[in-house]
């Protein structure tokens, strides 16, 4: 028996797989989930979810949301998610550099918050790409 993981965005099911273990980017840190985990509802931060299928770890970029764990079913509801195979490394590097530059230029509170969110997303994308190397 294993965990069934569903990653859902407002407009589609992004990912549905059976895995042995997942590590979630919760708002309080990394959260590991194995079979028969106690029921749980947790907030998710921007970051990389890692799922272990047999002996392979598969990363998925999550952009904040919630996860519900119950009876070996993990339902993840996020504002957006990206599979690593859909991320272009060169574009991700450019986005990271642009995000860092925008962070330095931000003046208003709104600009600072938006640039911080964009920077966190760019870092998560690069972290996911680098985890495959």
Curated annotation (Swiss-Prot):
Main subcellular localisation: plastid
Membrane topology: Peripheral membrane protein
Subcellular location as annotated: Plastid, Chloroplast thylakoid membrane
Single GO MF annotation: ATP binding
One Pfam family it belongs to: ATP-synt_DE_N
GO cellular-component term (any): chloroplast thylakoid membrane
Superkingdom assignment: Eukaryota
Record's keyword terms, sorted: ATP synthesis, CF(1), Chloroplast, Hydrogen ion transport, Ion transport, Membrane, Plastid, Thylakoid, Transport
Signal sequence range: none
Family: Belongs to the ATPase epsilon chain family.
Subunit structure: F-type ATPases have 2 components, CF(1) - the catalytic core - and CF(0) - the membrane proton channel. CF(1) has five subunits: alpha(3), beta(3), gamma(1), delta(1), epsilon(1). CF(0) has three main subunits: a, b and c.
Function, in words: Produces ATP from ADP in the presence of a proton gradient across the membrane.
HAMAP family: ATP_synth_epsil_bac
Name the record gives this protein: ATP synthase epsilon chain, chloroplastic
Lineage, broadest ranks: Eukaryota, Rhodophyta, Bangiophyceae, Cyanidiales, Cyanidiaceae
